[in-house]
Each structure stands twice: as C-alpha cells, then as structure tokens.
Design a protein with these regions (language model features):
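Extended, regular secondary-structure scaffolds
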Residues: 56, 60-61, 66-185
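Long, highly charged low-complexity segments enriched in Glu/Asp and Lys/Arg with interspersed Ser/Thr
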Residues: 380, 385-417
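Extended, charged amphipathic alpha-helical segments
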Residues: 152-302, 345, 356
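Extended amphipathic alpha-helical segments with heptad-repeat/coiled-coil character used for oligomerization
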Residues: 305, 309, 313, 320, ...
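Active/binding-pocket-proximal capping segment
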Residues: 275, 289-296, 321, 328-348, ...
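Extended, helix-rich architectural segments
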Residues: 1-100, 411-412, 417, 423-424
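Active-site-proximal structural scaffolding
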Residues: 60, 189, 193, 264, ...
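Glycine- and charge-rich intrinsically disordered segments
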Residues: 201-208, 215, 219, 406-424
C-alpha cells in the first residue's frame, strides 16, 4: 500500500525540548564570592535564563549554540545574545581543524534599488582576537560575490568597519552538542535517528489512511438493493433499509480488507525501541510508563540513567562556555571603561538535574547528612532545599538561632508555700 505522509508526530522536537528542560528547566545558580552583584546584573540585563533555554534547543537541532557579545551605547552591561548557528562559519587552524582561531558570521540581506529590482547583499562580521571587522558585499543573481558595498546601504549611522575590542579573545562563544576530532562543527541530536523518525511518521500515516478508508467502506449485493436517484439518475443504496434476498441471490455486504494493522503496531514498537536507543531516551522520559505508580526521586533517576547521562554531557559543554562568556563580558566592559566591573572573575555554576523535587526524600537525606557526623552545613541544606539568595538564607539562619535561644531559656519553678501551718 502506498501512503502519503500526512501525519507527523514530531518526535525530534520532543527530544530537543526534553533535554532543554533537563538542562535549564530549573535555572542554575551563578555564584561569585567577589562579584555576585555584577553577575546578577549581567544575568538580569540579558535575560540569560531564557537565552540559555533557546541555546539548548539550538544546540540540540543545529549541533551547536552560538553566543555573541557586544556593547550598546547607553547600556552599562555588555549584551549577550544567542545567534543562529546557521550563519556561523569558524576559521580554523590548518594543522588542527578543531582549533578555532576566529569566527565569521555571514548572512544575506536584500534591498530594492531605484528600478524596483531586489538586490542581494552578503553581510559579514569577522570576529578575531582583539578586533571585529564589519563587511558588506553585493551579490549577483546567482549568489556570486561581486564588489564591496558601503555599510551605509543598510545602517545609519553605519558601524565601524574595523574596531578594536580590547579583549584578547574573539567575542563569540560556541557550545557544541557533541564534538568529533575531524570537524569544528558539533553533531546534532537528530542525524543518528533520521530514518527512524521517517519510519515512525510513515507507519502512523499508513494506519490513519487505512482507518479513514474503512469509515466509508464499499458495498456489494444484488441489483434489487439499488434504487435510482431521481435528481441525478445514479443507482444508489439507501442506508437503513431491509433487503429481501432470494434463494440464489448473494446477500448485501461490505468489502472488508484485512490490513494486518497488528503487524504495523508491532513494527511501531520496534521503531520506538530504536528511537530510545539512538536518542538516549526512554518511555519514562516522556511520562509513558504503563504502570500506574509514580516513582520516587531516586527511582526516577535510575529510570532516566541514559537521558541524564546525555544531559550531563551537554552540561559539561555549557558549563565551560557560560563561564567563558561571563569572563569575556567582564573583560569587554573593563576594557571599554564600564563601571563596577570585577577584575579576575571567579565564577562557579551550581547546576540542577531538571527532575521534579521530592521534598520528603530530600529532607530525609539532608537530615541524615546534618545529624551525627555532619557532612553538610545547615546553610547548604537550606540553599539546596529552599533556594533563595544569601540574604534570605542569613535571615533564615538568624530565625533558627533565635528559636534555639528561646528553647534554651532556664525553666521557671514555683516555690510551694504551706498555708495554715505554724512553726513549732
């Protein structure tokens, strides 16, 4: 049977959103002992939590996420933005293709000329250590680079063609999804399972086509079951009638075809198993467990060993890239005279696993760890269980100390007086 693909389950999109949720569904904490205020300002000014989620999606379906830093007149903090990896072209060392020396961001822009004809231009930003170079070229109709054009064609005022940044590294930070040793580009989460995605959608479309066909099946039977429509002249069968059948006449009936749908459903199960293997997911990751019980936190982590392992790999890349992004932003601001910029930024990122918290299980663990031989301070327990800023944690510790002080006050005892008694 030949079926047209009219049904798509978008399993790739579900994979990307799953790992983005595990990475940034719970926002990580950025901790700096000496520059916490600057770090918080930088995060708030750039909406970094939302930007990180977009970057995680891009990392999954493009193979890498790309951050770019720049300064904007009138803004105190540097601007960090996520740009499409489709416009990123690395400049690599000829002797080591994985070592990136610079970055070219290039995209096509269009503009109508005086004759109403659309002219294409190639816009490029070339990021090298210590400098940024802005360029614009006119393209021919078949996309060949022609003469160089003035940046004022699109911008007023135009950006400087050559600009010193004061930073010894390019202001572009790349987060690969999975690195390989023969390419500067990362591998996405889809390429290993492309054929399985196609087969899943195709089988579901075939089943849907069969079911649609059998909602209005063809009939067969004797001529006596037909009557002529006076409006159209066609011979039709009226539903809901009784047809008497002569001794030698075939009874009316429906044409039924055994589509072997059970085989299709079994094949879909095998496809899903292959998808789970290729994408490091499973039914539990998509809340498709057949049992009605809800696993606890520890049990859920055991069920999600493979998804969490891939998430940890992604987290390794993001941890390095984000700490580098913060460091470059501080250097850029300091080199261009921004205020309240830290010197050598020491940043630590506290990541979460993205799984729903089990408060009782977490509290029991913390109780064990903080009682007897304490392996965790009360401050750390409050931060992990309740979150909050350092100020709110200090306030909570002060309340705890006050409660303990009240509980340790000396007890007041009343002296018993004997009334009506006289001394001997």
């Amino acid at each position: 049977m030949r079926a047209t693909l009219e049904l798509a389950i978008n399993f790739p999109g579900a994979v990307s959103k799953l790992f983005s949720d595990l990475l940034f569904g719970e926002t990580p904490r950025y901790v700096s002992i000496d520059a916490q205020e600057w770090v918080d300002d930088f995060i708030a000014a750039n909406g970094l939590h939302r930007a990180n989620y977009r970057a995680a999606l891009a990392q999954s379906y493009r193979g890498e996420a790309v951050y770019k830093l720049r300064l904007v007149e009138g803004r105190e903090r540097a601007v960090a933005e996520v740009i499409p990896a489709s416009i990123w072209f690395p400049v690599t060392d000829p002797d080591n293709v994985t070592e990136i020396l610079g970055h070219v961001l290039a995209w096509v822009k269009t503009k109508e000329n005086g004759d109403g004809k659309v002219v294409k231009y190639l816009r490029a930003e070339i990021h090298l250590p210590g400098s940024i170079h802005q360029r614009l070229w006119r393209l021919s109709e078949d996309g060949i680079i022609q003469e160089r054009a003035d940046l004022g064609t699109f911008y007023s005022p135009p950006p400087p063609e050559d600009q010193e940044t004061g930073v010894e590294e390019p202001l572009v930070v790349v987060v690969p999804n999975l690195e390989v040793d023969d390419s500067p580009f990362g591998l996405d989460d889809y390429s290993e399972a492309d054929t399985l995605f196609h087969q899943l959608d195709l089988r579901l479309a075939q089943i849907a086509k069969v079911l649609d066909r059998h909602t209005d099946p063809n009939m067969y039977g004797p001529v006596s079951a037909l009557e002529q429509d006076p409006a159209t002249g066609e011979w039709v069968v009226r539903a809901g009638r009784y047809f008497p059948v002569a001794e030698n006449e075939p009874p009316p009936g429906y044409l039924v075809w055994d589509a072997k749908l059970e085989a299709n459903f079994r094949f879909i199960e095998h496809i899903m198993q292959g998808l789970y293997i290729a994408t490091d997911t499973n039914a539990a990751a998509f809340s498709l467990l057949e049992s009605g019980s809800v696993p606890s936190g520890a049990a859920l982590k055991r069920l999600l060993i493979r998804p969490l392992a891939r998430t940890n790999r992604k987290r390794l890349y993001f941890d390095v890239a984000l700490r580098r992004l913060f460091a470059l932003a501080a250097q850029l601001e300091r080199a261009n005279g921004r205020r309240d910029v830290p010197g050598d930024l020491d940043l630590h990122i506290e990541w979460k696993d993205g799984l729903p918290e089990d408060p009782r299980e977490a509290a029991e663990i913390e109780q064990i760890r903080t009682g007897g031989k304490a392996t965790s301070s009360v401050r750390s327990a409050i931060r992990r269980l309740d979150g909050g800023s350092e100020e709110s944690i200090e306030a909570e510790l002060a309340e705890i100390a006050a409660d303990e002080a009240r509980g340790e006050m000396p007890a007041v005892t009343l002296t018993t007086f004997g009334f009506g008694q006289t001394e001997e």
